[in-house]
A protein has these predicted regions:
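Bacterial Sec-dependent N-terminal signal peptides
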Residues: 1-23
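Sequence/structural signature of beta-propeller domains
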Residues: 20-305
Length: 305
């Protein structure tokens, strides 16, 4: 079920305090074959690992697709009753429930993963609205250890920075969703308007936030993986923003683009074993969820060898 296209990926790290030379753990980058239904206009814009499965959030189709990466099959679909003008741009889990963030009308929603029932999440301050350039809230990541949520804004109004907001969790009543209290915001500089951050996820074992960053101009793309350290209280430390070198990430991206794959990478997640997954959104603009898309969805796996 895996592509023969195999790319060796090296993640570099070293300990300054011990004066050790760079360590070069060997990783592989693989294209996990998806079933044909994922080549419809599913426009996946977020992804979360939970219980050994991957939960795909569709930006414009009212469904969450549950995928088994070992079997390479869709386990089930979770229909959801989304509000009008909803654009699901990111998904995470917190205490056995799904949480999605909407871009067009900026809001966070709690989703029952068994029946798809939705409840609105109250935030102590309004989320930034979608800008005139079409940028808005793009990702959400929950930190269960510290009871925090991190919310990603793709680009600010002048397109010079991406922003990540930290919210603390306030428990809700039995029939209500949790609440989120705004605590802080950090900015991540962008070299120019062609750059953006498209998703985030928490790597709790390594106390860091993984960030998916990309450059796009015409058909050419550059892909990057970055990290921000999380302190013991759950606060993001922007001064620790670090590139995680992934050899041939960009080269592989442009090679797959010539094979009719969408390389608009919109979702990132990490499983309990430390395997990182990245997925693309294969449809721009309006979507006809039952029709084939011009490009195929791609699911990439970054794994230690």
């Amino acid at each position: 079920m895996r592509s023969h296209f195999l790319v060796l990926v090296f993640l570099f790290s070293f300990s300054i305090s011990q004066g050790q030379p760079p360590q070069v753990p060997l990783h592989t980058l693989e294209n996990i074959a998806l079933p044909g239904e994922m080549n419809k206009q599913v426009c996946i814009s977020g992804m979360q690992s939970y219980g050994g499965e991957l939960y795909f959030a569709s930006e414009r189709c009212p469904v969450i697709i549950v995928f088994d990466p070992v079997k390479g099959t869709v386990s089930r679909n979770i229909p959801i009753q989304v509000p009008q003008q909803f654009e699901m741009e990111g998904i995470t889990t917190y205490k056995d429930k799904l949480y999605a963030i909407s871009e067009n009308v900026a809001a966070v929603y709690e989703i029952n993963m068994q029946n798809g029932n939705i409840l609105p999440v109250t935030t102590s301050s309004s989320l930034p609205p979608k800008s005139k350039s079409g940028d808005g809230m793009e990702g959400v990541a929950a930190n269960e250890k510290n009871n925090k949520f991190y919310l990603l804004r793709e680009r600010d109004d002048d397109m010079s920075h991406s922003q990540i907001y930290t919210f603390s969790v306030e428990p809700g009543a039995a029939t209500q969703a949790i609440g989120l209290k705004n605590e802080s915001m950090i900015e991540l500089p962008l070299e120019n308007p062609q750059w953006r951050y498209s998703d985030i996820c928490v790597d709790i074992k390594n106390s860091r936030l993984l960030c998916l960053k990309s450059y796009s101009k015409g058909k050419f793309r550059q892909q990057f993986l970055e990290s921000i350290s999380i302190d013991p209280a759950g606060n993001l430390l922007p001064q620790t923003l670090t590139n995680i070198p992934v050899e041939n990430f960009t080269e592989a991206s442009n090679a797959y683009k010539t094979q009719d794959y969408s390389m608009n990478l919109e979702g990132i997640t990490i499983d309990s074993a430390g395997t990182i997954y990245v997925i693309s959104d294969n449809t721009s603009g309006k979507a006809n969820c039952d029709m084939l898309a011009k490009e195929k969805t791609i699911l990439l796996e970054i794994r230690k060898k």
